[in-house]
Amino acid sequence: MTKLGRLLFVFLLLLCTTQLFADKKKVVEPTLEGEAKVQFDYAFMEGVRCKVLGDLKSAIAYFDQCMKIYNKSAAVRYELSSILVLGEDYTLPLQLMREAVELEPTNIWYNLLLANILQRKSMIEEACKVYDKLI
């Protein structure tokens, strides 16, 4: 085989390999752009501000507005859940945190709040699995 033949062979091999791995790229979720992003960011920051100031009803309203604008936000689910967990019913906070962890499984804070809620609901085995995953 000549040098040109070898170079052509290597080039084709690299091209095929690149194509093979290119097909396995993660699908990128659509994100917010333009006015929707501005509205979402404003509502989220106002929700955090209200939460810090102790105005939990307003915070919930702002975070609910965020969910209407973009319902794939794990951060909004976390913030809502961290407020709702202060009540007696843990059903909705548990659902929100399961969804948040599903959206971002490697986020430590989401997993910790999920495990905490599971403990409060006396779902100890499931909470242990979440803690074990964190270790």
Where are these regions (language model features)?
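TPR-adjacent "capping" and linker segments in tetratricopeptide-repeat scaffold/adaptor proteins
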Residues: 26-42
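Register position in tetratricopeptide repeats
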Residues: 52-53, 86-87, 120-121
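Canonical positions in the second alpha-helix
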Residues: 65-66, 99-100, 133-134
